[in-house]
Amino acid sequence: MSEAFDCAKCSESLYGRKYIQTDDGPYCVPCYDNTFANTCAECQQLIGHDSRELFYEDRHFHEGCFRCCRCQRSLADEPFTCQDSELLCNDCYCSAFSSQCSACGETVMPGSRKLEYGGQTWHEHCFLCSGCEQPLGSRSFVPDKGAHYCVPCYENKFAPRCARCSKTLTQGGVTYRDQPWHRECLVCTGCQTPLAGQQFTSREDDPYCVTCFGELFAPKCSSCKRPITGLGGGKYVSFEDRHWHHSCFSCARCSTSLVGQGFVPDGDQVLCQGCSQAGP
């Protein structure tokens, strides 16, 4: 009598039948599949011992069931992406979820480096400065009417230029004769003292501090001999070819102010009418 050779699960004889040997003993094919086979995540059927099995994360699939959920293309030998538990071929994923580069018009592939600004997307290598055409990457940039400029190019193209040195003004500055100047460039033509923040005047478009202008161009007071600049609302009196500060225009004898009063010239001096009538 022959030795028993039965299935470890159903105990039916395996003589003359196909079986599969395991560490637990031999199994007939139906019992093996029912005991050890995984269930396909797509069709919910067992993946038999004679089927090619594919798995992704903790899910198992028949080879024929491992497909793009949109176009049904087999993903067995294709790159794919999982989106919200759905398997998608790269073409379908790009069509549904990827954006188009605003520069070259090509698809920005999943996982590639990109930049987004103002609702638009660029490949990293396509996001260029409109001036120097170098990639902007993570550098600061300035948008202008649909163009994008790195800071140096924007300043070179649009920033105002100093009337003296012709270099761009990136911050601050002063205005003189409706033109922009660097604060350090607006200096007195005479002594080179910075004029920003202080009172100054000009001659033939050249700026001068009050001191230099007075020394170089202003008439001198016939009394105190100091320059009469007329700046800051300062008033003065002129008579013939002589000039006086208001505060200096007084009688040479009694020192009475002659502003708005009659006076009598007496050589290099001026006298009030009283002193003139009194005689020498």
UniProtKB/Swiss-Prot annotation:
Residue intervals of the LIM zinc-binding domain: 40-92, 101-153, 162-212, 221-275
SMART domains, per database record: LIM
InterPro entries assigned: LIM_FHL1/2/3/5_N, Znf_LIM
Main location: nucleus
Listed CDD domains: LIM1_FHL3, LIM2_FHL3, LIM3_FHL, LIM4_FHL3
UniProt keyword list: Acetylation, Activator, Cytoplasm, LIM domain, Metal-binding, Nucleus, Repeat, Transcription, Transcription regulation, Zinc, Zinc-finger
A molecular function GO annotation: zinc ion binding
Any GO BP: actin cytoskeleton organization
GO cellular component, one term: stress fiber
Subcellular location: Nucleus; Cytoplasm
Positions of post-translational N-acetylserine modification: S2
Positions of post-translational N6-acetyllysine modification: K157, K235
Zn finger (C4-type) location: 7-31
Role, per record: Recruited by SOX15 to FOXK1 promoters where it acts as a transcriptional coactivator of FOXK1.
Quaternary data: Interacts with SOX15; the interaction recruits FHL3 to FOXK1 promoters where it acts as a transcriptional coactivator of FOXK1.
Protein name, per record: Four and a half LIM domains protein 3
Top-level taxonomy: Eukaryota, Metazoa, Chordata, Craniata, Vertebrata
Gene that this sequence comes from: FHL3
